[in-house]
């Protein structure tokens, strides 16, 4: 039977991120992606001014209630950027309802980067996001978010292996079955992720070449590709490997083409290869 994932993210019309990345990538994995939009924006907010924004917080409980009235069940809940503590609480309640059956919860605690919280968030939001992460089976933080979640010091790349593993062990206090830590770099020429599989205690790493520039939306692309692979029955380490390869190919394609990275990376032309990876 086809798996179904509730993808809870905003919609940015331009930028190839959030739901506009999650829906096609998860669908390419052969998994149904049901969208619960948290907001609608004309573009993403990274290095772009003048964007429009419409908050959909008030619609989220009604969407959840309608789905529940129809008897819709989910094999996974996958949440990304949430704009307020109220949205975090709504998602937390939705997870509780979804867990009446077998349901994998995947949380990307999007709230910080490069050593700092996003400007619209504060320590209270971080505490609420930490509570949401405690309901997750898989957490996908970057280095900054991991440091916040486990109360550790943030350190700029390049990283020492001991530091990365201290973050993973700090996050092992969370009930999650796995932690996928993104933005890991042991040298200036590569970047990737560290994967803690708590069922075995194994830590594995996946790296790709680091290309010049800032590429918006790649965190969403990575997490969506990982979600699709995991729902297809791949292990968490296999899912992270596939997601890393897929994300790098999108960055490389964009870098070679020389297109404006503010408007997202070309992941679409890699969807066929992603499907093939899932069949390897």
Regions found by a protein language model. Give the residues of each.
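Conserved phosphate/ATP/ADP-binding segment of small-molecule kinases
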Residues: 119-203, 234
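Conserved N-terminal subdomain of the carbohydrate kinase-like
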Residues: 2-107, 111-119, 268-272, 276
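Short, small-residue alpha-helix embedded
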Residues: 148, 213-236
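Short pre-catalytic strand/loop immediately N-terminal to key active-site residues, enriched for Gly-Thr
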Residues: 13, 203-217
């Amino acid at each position: 039977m086809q798996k179904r994932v509730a993808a809870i993210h905003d919609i940015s019309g331009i930028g190839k991120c959030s739901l506009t990345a999650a829906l096609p990538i998860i669908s390419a994995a052969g998994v149904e992606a049901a969208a619960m939009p948290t907001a609608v924006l004309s573009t993403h907010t990274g290095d772009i001014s003048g964007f429009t924004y419409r908050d959909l917080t008030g619609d989220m409980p009604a969407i959840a209630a309608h789905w529940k009235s129809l008897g819709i069940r989910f094999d996974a809940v996958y949440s990304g950027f949430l704009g307020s503590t109220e949205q975090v609480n709504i998602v937390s309640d939705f997870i509780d309802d979804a867990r009446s059956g077998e349901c994998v919860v995947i949380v990307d605690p999007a709230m910080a980067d490069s050593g700092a919280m996003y400007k619209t968030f504060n320590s209270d939001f971080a505490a609420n996001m930490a509570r949401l992460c405690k309901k997750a089976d898989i957490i996908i933080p970057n280095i900054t978010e991991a440091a916040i979640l486990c109360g550790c010091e943030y350190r700029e790349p390049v990283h020492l292996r001991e530091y990365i593993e201290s973050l993973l062990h700090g996050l092992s206090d969370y009930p999650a079955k796995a932690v996928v830590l993104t933005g890991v770099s042991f040298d200036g020429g590569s970047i990737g992720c560290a994967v803690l599989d708590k069922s075995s205690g194994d830590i594995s790493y996946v790296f790709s070449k680091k290309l010049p520039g800032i590429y918006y939306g790649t965190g969403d692309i990575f997490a969506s590709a990982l979600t699709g692979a995991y729902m297809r029955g791949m292990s968490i380490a296999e899912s992270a490997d596939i997601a890393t390869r897929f994300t790098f190919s999108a960055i490389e394609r964009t870098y070679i083409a020389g297109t404006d990275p503010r408007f997202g990376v070309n992941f679409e032309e890699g969807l066929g290869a992603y499907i093939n990876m899932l069949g390897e």
